[in-house]
Each structure stands twice: as C-alpha cells, then as structure tokens.
Amino acid sequence: MNAEVPAEGSIPFAGVADLAILKGAELTNVSVWKYGVTLSFNDEPLTITVENNAEFQSQGRTEIFNQEIIIGFGARMLSLVGRCVSDMQATEDKAIVLSFDDGSKLALRPDDSGYESYTVNLPNGSIFVG
C-alpha cells in the first residue's frame, strides 16, 4: 500500500494507487442520510461516502447530484447493489470514475470550495479524500 505514514494517533491517507482495491469489488450496501450517501463494497470496511459532486451515467443518461439533492443519488445507486466494479480510474487531481458491470458509471470529483466531496475508507484503515 502507498498510504502515507501518519503521526501517532492520526488516520493514514491513501494514495491513488491504493484505490485499485475497488476494481472487482461488489456493491453490497447503500446507506442514505440527509447530507450524504455511503456505498459499501464486499461486505467489508471498504466504503465511499459521497456528500457532493456525484455524476451517475446509465442507459445513455447522465445525472449530476450536488449536496441539495444527494438523496436522489442514493436512490440511483440502489439499482447497482449486487453489481461489481469492472473498471476504476483515478487521477492525481482526485477525480474517480467507477464503471460497473452493467455499463453504469459513477464519477466523483472534489469541489472547488475546499470541502471534501467524497471519502474512500479502505480496509487497512487509511482514507482517500476528494
């Protein structure tokens, strides 16, 4: 793993290469609350929490979800429970695109406000923030 060495008691940060663990992962749970959506994979501590800037593509349609309508994003993601990530792309500017085995795509990007749009929690305890 490429996780940075943290100060004592702090959470280690993951690098882009660490996100490869998502390729082949099965979406096993979608949790929705007022300000975000958590996607859980492989029934293990591998999650993506999304609070803003989610783009969902399916059957030729693209929908963009900001924080005001993030609950709608959660509803869309329910259709992918049981589906696997067939491809994952991540860039150094922290944009992530997950392609699912049914052809759907999820794109996550950091926003310009300085607040996090999403967080990936990896089984080793490290996090990737975008």
Descriptions of predicted regions:
Residues 1-130:
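Surface-exposed, interaction-prone regions used to assemble/regulate multi-protein complexes
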